[in-house]
Amino acid sequence: MIAGTLPPPPVAGLMQFDLVSADPGRAVFSCRPDESAYNPIGAVHGGLVCALLDSVLGCALHSTLPQGRGYTSVEIKVNYLKAVRLSSGLLTATGTVVKSGTRVAFTEGVVTDASNATVATASSTLLVFDL
């Protein structure tokens, strides 16, 4: 996707996710949520932050897989540490692979706001399989 040879997935456009960088075992996404992502109490819905983390963690794992292998999330645990609002500015999500086996992988991620404050962290388990 960074080289422009693959299009971003449709969900990235819907949720305004941008792939910033990807290296083997690590990926960085950004997102600037707007009021369309607000929940009833005037903060960005936690589901957007969870989806951002799930996406960056999957991409981090994908960067390590050979052609013909895929993955799907089995479990994700998110810790919400600070409310996200328009004033939070650009969100940056970083995902890293902790361990990847032939069938299961473990990842960790963090989301920071424009002031570099951590707004959420996550750990995830992913199933790895042949396509």
Where are these regions (language model features)?
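Terminal targeting signals and extreme-terminal segments of soluble enzymes
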Residues: M1-L131
